[in-house]
């Protein structure tokens, strides 16, 4: 339920708010897309935390660049 709420908020932002502002994200994928993917993979708490950390890095003093969501490690592989 919380996952759907967070993803819904991100969807509204991406669909209605982001198009009205100039592109300023220093990363690829964008911070909102990164957060959406992180929540999809890691759930609302860890994924949300990862998204917040990413957003806090998105400022003019950080070089930015390609920064995808890390793959989830398989705990059963040796």
Curated annotation (Swiss-Prot):
InterPro entries: Membr_insert_effic_factor_YidD
Keyword entries, A-Z: Cell membrane, Membrane
Membrane topology: Peripheral membrane protein
Main localisation: membrane
Keyword Membrane: yes
Entry's family note: Belongs to the UPF0161 family.
NCBIfam families for the chain: membrane protein insertion efficiency factor YidD (TIGR00278)
Function: Could be involved in insertion of integral membrane proteins into the membrane.
Protein name: Putative membrane protein insertion efficiency factor
Native organism: Staphylococcus haemolyticus (strain JCSC1435)
